[in-house]
Amino acid sequence: MATRGSGPRAPRLLLLVQLVAGRCGLAGAAGGAQRGLSEPSSIAKHEDSLLKDLFQDYERWVRPVEHLNDKIKIKFGLAISQLVDVDEKNQLMTTNVWLKQEWIDVKLRWNPDDYGGIKVIRVPSDSVWTPDIVLFDNADGRFEGTSTKTVIRYNGTVTWTPPANYKSSCTIDVTFFPFDLQNCSMKFGSWTYDGSQVDIILEDQDVDKRDFFDNGEWEIVSATGSKGNRTDSCCWYPYVTYSFVIKRLPLFYTLFLIIPCIGLSFLTVLVFYLPSNEGEKICLCTSVLVSLTVFLLVIEEIIPSSSKVIPLIGEYLVFTMIFVTLSIMVTVFAINIHHRSSSTHNAMAPWVRKIFLHTLPKLLCMRSHVDRYFTQKEETESGSGPKSSRNTLEAALDSVRCITRHIMKENDVREVVEDWKFIAQVLDRMFLWTFLFVSIVGSLGLFVPVIYKWANILIPVHIGNANK
């Protein structure tokens, strides 16, 4: 009986066991999936719990120290991302920087094991105590950086790197414009805390330029920081000063300002190469003078108005304007000499004839002027016609002598005019070489020393950057 009854029951029992096992497997898979989904939510709960515990009794206006005499040490650094502009007229430097600050907040410490292994959290800077470090020499009224999140570690280390756009005051020295170097400083310090409460530690003497975006007009030669202290009757106040030595890239001003000015100065020299009787010489000089005046107005719009120093390009323009003014005066004098005659002026002095008709032409490589007046006069005085006893011949000779004297008088007048014209040519040639020499020496004397100094600063900086 037991054997017959056990046959049909065995398949049923096996089917029941498989069904129960399948249900248990589904339940286990569902439980595993539920545990996988609940793991991230548990981390978020841990972080929520951590933030509630940290900021439950936290007051961000209170300096986070355990004892009253403890001071907070702020590790301070600066990273520059862009030199936006240098306004010479208003003497401002605009920069985009990052203020790197790090300190210990004793009220923001926790044990990572109690909060699911969380070691770092990020909270808005408005929720924690932050040092009131500002830029002292700000020029636009914005003394602090942007409110961004702080990074807090479990040991209480708070790192805050807010970006900031600053317009800082910068005394512009335009002596060597456009080959100038400027030294602009940015001074940071606490606005209310003294050194016994908040001390600033310079993290790195060099400004971080790894993310710097090049400027098309200025190049940063060096950017270094130094720490200082300001003391008064009761307290001392630490501060950090960053000095930016920036160098102007002069290519634009060289092409569109200096080279045209040099061209105008040499164009003035060519005035003396025109014929002495040309009235257009005055027009050319006047046109050059007007052009230089326009250049002066352009420079006046760029550089700051200061009576302490005169910029290099301003000195050159003033030099060229004096140069052109003298050329106008000399040209007027030469034209006056050119149009002189015996009927309008007295006879030429012997020393004038000797210097301008004999000596200077040889020195100026001009063809020697033949003194036809004296030559023809000597030939006339040395020549004598035969004496005729006949009255008709005497009468004819008297007529010839009269005609000869008249012709000689006209020749004398013509030769005096030609002598004055030749003196005008000598003056033009003399001033041509004189003004050319002065123009070359003046241009080289003004620009070469400055360019040499500028190159000596530029080359070592690039060599040092290449070695790095």
UniProtKB/Swiss-Prot annotation:
Residues 338-429 are cytoplasmic. It comes from Pan troglodytes (Chimpanzee). Keywords: Cell membrane, Disulfide bond, Glycoprotein, Ion channel, Ion transport, Ligand-gated ion channel, Membrane, Receptor, Signal, Synapse, Transmembrane, Transmembrane helix, Transport. It is a multi-pass membrane protein. Disulfide bonds join C170-C184, C234-C235. InterPro entries: Neur_chan_lig-bd, Neur_chan_lig-bd_sf, Neur_channel, Neuro-gated_channel_TM_sf, Neuro_actylchol_rec, Neurotrans-gated_channel_TM, Neurotransmitter_ion_chnl_CS, Nicotinic_acetylcholine_rcpt. Residues 23-254, 452-468 are extracellular. Gene3D superfamilies: Neurotransmitter-gated ion-channel ligand-binding domain, Neurotransmitter-gated ion-channel transmembrane domain. Activated by a myriad of ligands such as acetylcholine, cytisine, nicotine, choline and epibatidine. Residues 1-22 form the signal peptide. Belongs to the ligand-gated ion channel (TC 1.A.9) family. Acetylcholine receptor (TC 1.A.9.1) subfamily. Alpha-5/CHRNA5 sub-subfamily. It is found in: Synaptic cell membrane; Cell membrane. It catalyses: Ca(2+)(in) = Ca(2+)(out); K(+)(in) = K(+)(out); Na(+)(in) = Na(+)(out). This is Neuronal acetylcholine receptor subunit alpha-5. One of its GO terms (biological process) is synaptic transmission, cholinergic. Glycans are attached at N155, N183, N229. The lineage of its organism: Eukaryota, Metazoa, Chordata, Craniata, Vertebrata. Component of neuronal acetylcholine receptors (nAChRs) that function as pentameric, ligand-gated cation channels with high calcium permeability among other activities. nAChRs are excitatory neurotrasnmitter receptors formed by a collection of nAChR subunits known to mediate synaptic transmission in the nervous system and the neuromuscular junction. Each nAchR subunit confers differential attributes to channel properties, including activation, deactivation and desensitization kinetics, pH sensitivity, cation permeability, and binding to allosteric modulators. NCBIfam families: LIC.
